[in-house]
Regions:
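Anaerobic metallocofactor- and corrinoid-dependent redox/one-carbon enzyme cores
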Residues: 2-630
């Protein structure tokens, strides 16, 4: 057996440099060049001190002009911008959940979409107080879909999933006016508060930012996660591979990119069919390879083992290989640059959602009723495009690593059951993990999430932080592009246990797990909140007492701000490697890094130096252990 070895960031960069050489031959643009054209960035924007919410401005705050034309000071301007940032992210993630609810409503026996996990559907229905006895599973699915959709606009009450929190936490959120009500109400209220002539008090703006984020995390995202499991199956550990080397030169290569599993699941279904594989062979290919980018990739990897071609800043690379017949996208994190780039090659750039329409793309409207027909047409289009490849432009970097993915909360509990003495101990709980933490075998956990950002060397922060954490016996749970960075490096290979401290290594060996656990897409950060709640309930603690922190070292999107706010709102300290455009206001900085503790028991830490950031995380975990006397 060959010795296990991580793939380094330097190797990632060498592969990218070679692909950019191909791009130069055809005059292709790439993000590396656009970053240079946009540098330096606007300092007013970076500090959050520019206001353009009315037509009296734009106003920008300087020492000579400390207030906007309306009289709003820097603290109000930064606060409003932060709230609008959050609202856009919460709307986006929650709309994903809404789409999944609609897909669930369209599910039927023998249809395009079916209920793959009826037990989970019944469990959630009982949790919500919906009668299940004697009901056809699809009647129940439709009722639950409608009930879920009501969470977006119900006139009264709070998000149903808040009842999953430990005793007293929901009540504290209500008391502090940060418990989320209807999802759309929180987004609408946020935009109203940020309108000219409304809120300019930083404390009120931060409170609503947390409330809006909580509507995402404990509302839209949680429904998106839970109902995706009902439709497509609850993830369990499955082996896959990651990095550009998963593309196969002799095959038709279809890359799915975006966030909605409704599209990618159907593409995979038809690409796996004998009819389409035979058709691919008839045009000279040996078969069909579907791989993924971003969170769509995470979705199909953890349920089907579909390989991961890369994360956010690798989306152009899959086209630059010259071997991508079609890049099929749904919503979010998609570069508009993919259209012009694809025209430099033979690649078909196919958009499928009216929410994400782009120039230089072929638009095939995808919906639940015609999903099979749409998917088949897309796969056929990719196969027909195989003959248009330009062999002189084909180069697939031979970089890939093995990864074990698919650690849903249910899967983690099952893994814990495997190391439990069922004759003595209770099964179906997180108590074995708690025992490891209490004894000090594992010091704590870090939820590593988020994007890539050209402001930080891509993937470097994710990988280096993870390596140092696991060496210090801190287990990592990861999602989104952070999870893909880990997978590309090899940190989701079970052999990576050899990089751990002695305690975590022993746990990995006993439980047969990698030290970095793949929990899914960015929407699936809701799984992390559920896991934290279960740990708190099983230990008799509140979430903010657990030796657990969150980290988004390379975040870039509005969704990430919403996520950060619901992680802090849940009671988990959150560490950022990129400033959330709040540095221009001392009051906002104080509120975000300390003031929120009085409402949630958690706050942000912003540190751009990666070595300092990881030390601060470890220090915080140890502080929590000391407070618990463990």
């Amino acid at each position: 057996m060959s010795e296990f070895k991580l793939t380094t960031v330097e190797e990632f960069e060498e592969a990218t440099a070679r692909l950019l050489e191909t791009g130069a031959k055809v005059g292709a643009d790439a993000w590396q060049f656009r970053v240079k054209n946009q540098t330096p960035h606007c300092k007013f924007g970076e500090q959050g001190v520019c206001c353009r919410i009315c037509a009296m401005g734009p106003c920008r705050i300087t020492p000579k002009a400390p207030r906007g034309i309306c009289g709003c000071d820097v603290h109000g301007i930064v606060g409003r911008n932060f709230l609008k940032f959050t609202a856009a992210g919460a709307a986006t993630h929650s709309d994903h959940g809404r789409e999944i609810c609609h897909t669930l409503y369209c599910a039927k026996d023998g249809g395009n979409y079916q209920v793959k996990d009826p037990e989970k559907l019944i469990r959630i229905a009982k949790e919500w107080g919906v009668e299940t006895e004697g009901k056809d599973i699809y009647d129940l699915a439709h009722e639950m879909a409608e009930t879920g959709l009501m969470e977006y606009g119900k006139p009264f009450g709070y998000q149903r999933f808040l009842d999953r929190m430990p005793a007293g936490q929901k009540e504290k959120l209500i008391e502090n006016e940060i418990a989320p009500r209807a999802i759309d109400r929180e987004v609408s209220t946020s935009l109203h508060m940020a309108h000219m002539g409304c809120s300019s008090l930083p404390e009120a703006l931060v409170k609503q930012s947390i409330r809006c984020g909580m509507a995402d995390g404990w509302g839209g995202s949680m429904m998106g996660t839970e109902f995706s499991d009902v439709l497509f199956g609850t993830p369990k550990p499955i082996d896959t591979e990651a990095n550009l080397g998963v593309m196969v030169e002799e095959n038709v290569n279809i890359v799915v990119h975006g966030h909605d599993p409704s599209l990618s699941e159907m593409i995979c279904e038809y690409a796996d069919s004998k009819e389409m594989i035979d058709y691919a062979k008839s045009v000279g290919a040996k078969g069909i390879t579907v791989s993924g980018v971003c969170c769509t990739s995470n979705e199909v990897a953890m349920r089907r083992g579909v390989p991961m071609a890369g994360n956010f800043l690798q989306q152009e690379n899959v086209v630059l290989t010259g071997a991508c017949e079609a890049i099929v996208v749904d919503v979010q994190c998609i570069f508009p640059a993919l259209g012009p780039l694809s025209k430099c090659f033979h690649t078909k750039f196919i958009t499928t959602s009216p929410i994400a329409q782009m120039p230089d793309a072929e638009f095939i409207r995808f919906n639940a009723e015609t999903a099979g027909e749409n998917a088949k047409a897309i796969v056929k289009m990719a196969i027909d495009n195989f003959k248009n490849r330009k062999p002189e432009l084909v180069h697939i970097p031979q970089l890939k690593q093995k990864a074990t993915v698919g650690y849903s909360v249910e899967a983690i509990v099952k893994v814990l059951d495997s190391v439990t003495n069922s004759q003595v101990d209770e099964t179906g709980t997180t108590k074995p993990l708690l025992e490891c933490i209490t004894s000090g075998v594992i010091r704590g956990a870090v939820a590593m999430v988020g994007c890539n950002n050209p402001k930080i060397r891509p993937d470097y922060a994710h990988i280096e932080l993870m390596k140092k954490c696991i060496a210090n016996d801190i287990v990592i749970i990861a999602s989104g592009c952070s999870a893909q960075a880990a997978a590309k490096a090899g940190l989701m290979d079970k052999s990576a246990k050899d990089l751990c401290g002695a305690g975590l290594k022993r746990v990995c060996e006993l439980a047969d797990i990698p030290p970095v656990l793949h929990m899914g897409s960015c929407v699936d950060i809701s799984r992390m909140m559920i896991l934290a709640a279960e740990l708190a309930k099983d230990s008799g603690l509140q979430i903010n007492q657990l030796p657990v922190v969150g980290c988004a070292p390379e975040w870039m999107s509005e969704k990430a701000v919403s996520i950060g706010n619901y992680v802090v709102g849940t009671g988990i300290d959150t560490f950022l490697g990129v400033d959330p455009y709040a540095s221009g206001s001392s009051e906002m900085c104080e509120l975000l890094t300390e003031g929120t503790r009085k409402w949630t028991g958690a706050a942000y830490t912003v540190e751009k130096d990666i070595d300092k950031l990881v030390d601060l995380m470890i220090e915080r975990i140890e502080e929590k252990r000391t407070a618990l006397g463990i």
